[in-house]
Amino acid sequence: MIEADRLIAPISNHFKDEEVIDRAIRPKKLADYQGQDHVRDQMEIFIQAAQMRQEALDHLLIFGPPGLGKTTLANIVANEMGVNIRTTSGPVLEKAGDLAALLTNLEENDVLFIDEIHRLSPMVEEVLYPAMEDYQLDIMIGEGPAARSIKIDLPPFTLIGATTRAGSLTSPLRDRFGIVQRLEYYKVADLQHIVQRSAQCLGLSMDSEGALEVARRARGTPRIANRLLRRVRDYAEVKGDGHICAQTADRALNMLDVDHQGFDYMDRKLLLAIMEKFSGGPVGIDNLAAAIGEEKDTIEDVLEPFLIQQGYLQRTPRGRIATDRAYLHFGIEK
C-alpha cells in the first residue's frame, strides 16, 4: 500500500475524481460551519464589523493539520462578505509577476486565497509585503543601471493564507496578518453532524448511529469523514439495502482496514516499527522514514499529528517514542 492509496490520508491524488463531490457538500455559510466554535464566533464578529465599515476584511492566516477545512473557511469568508475569491497556492507562484497578475485583477474587497503559503519564494514574499500593508505593488522595470521601480495602486483586498506549518512562515509575513486562526481536530459529536449533513447532501439513507460509527474513525478530520462516508455508501449499496446503520458502517470500515481508533495500515506500520524495530524509541525521523519507506514530510504532516494528539506517540529532542498507550493498543508488552 502506498500513500496515494491511503483511504484516511487527508490529501490523496487517488481521490481527485471526488473533489467535485467534496466541493458540493462543503458548507457555504458560517451558520452551516460545524465545529471550531471559537473560530466561527470570532469570524462572525470580524466579518460583520468589516461590512458595517464597508471595508475589506483584515488579512487572515488559517493554520492547522490537513483536512480540517482551511479552504472551506476561506470560501465561507468570501461568501459572507459577498465578494469574489481568487485561489492559488504557494508553489504555483514562482515569479513576482505571477503574483502581480493576480493582484492587479482583484476587485475592491475581493479575497485572494493562497494555500500552502509557507512555500512562497522569498522573491514573491517581497512583492506581497507592500501589497498587504499599503495596497501597493512595487515592480522593477528593466535591468541594470536602467532599472526603475514603479508603484501600482491596488484596490483594498483580503489575503487569506492557509498552511499546515505556521512555524515555517517568515516573521515579516506572519506579522502582516491581522487575524490568525488555528483549526483544531474535531470532536466526534461535531463530526457526526458533518457526516449526517453530507449524507443528506448526497441523498443517502443513514441513521445517527451509522454517522457516529463513521465519525469515530475519522481521526477528527472532516475530509476523512466524508471520504469514509462515500466508501461506506459503496459497501451499503453492494452488500446491503443501501441504508447505513452502525453495523453496516462497522463492517465496511473493518473491510477497509480502518480500526476503531481511525488507524489504517500506515499508522500501524509506523507505531509497530518504533516498538519492534527500535525498542519503542527514541528514533530519529530519518531512520523512521527509511524503516517504513515513507517521506519525512508525510510522516510529520500527515501521520504524526493525530498520533501525538491522541497520545500514542511523543516527539522528543532525541527522536520519536511510542507511548504506553500505543503498547496497550497493540497488546504488546514493553
UniProtKB/Swiss-Prot annotation:
Question: Which source organism does the UniProt entry give?
Answer: Vibrio cholerae serotype O1 (strain ATCC 39315 / El Tor Inaba N16961)
Family to which this protein belongs: Belongs to the RuvB family.
In this chain, the stretch annotated as Head domain (RuvB-H) covers 260-334
Record remark on domains: Has 3 domains, the large (RuvB-L) and small ATPase (RuvB-S) domains and the C-terminal head (RuvB-H) domain. The head domain binds DNA, while the ATPase domains jointly bind ATP, ADP or are empty depending on the state of the subunit in the translocation cycle. During a single DNA translocation step the structure of each domain remains the same, but their relative positions change.
CDD domains tied to this protein: AAA
This chain belongs to which protein, by name? Holliday junction branch migration complex subunit RuvB
UniProt keywords, alphabetically? ATP-binding, Cytoplasm, DNA damage, DNA recombination, DNA repair, DNA-binding, Hydrolase, Nucleotide-binding
Database matches in InterPro entries: AAA+_ATPase (IPR003593), AAA_lid_4 (IPR041445), DNA_helicase_Holl-junc_RuvB (IPR004605), P-loop_NTPase (IPR027417), RuvB-like_N (IPR008824), RuvB_C (IPR008823), WH-like_DNA-bd_sf (IPR036388), WH_DNA-bd_sf (IPR036390)
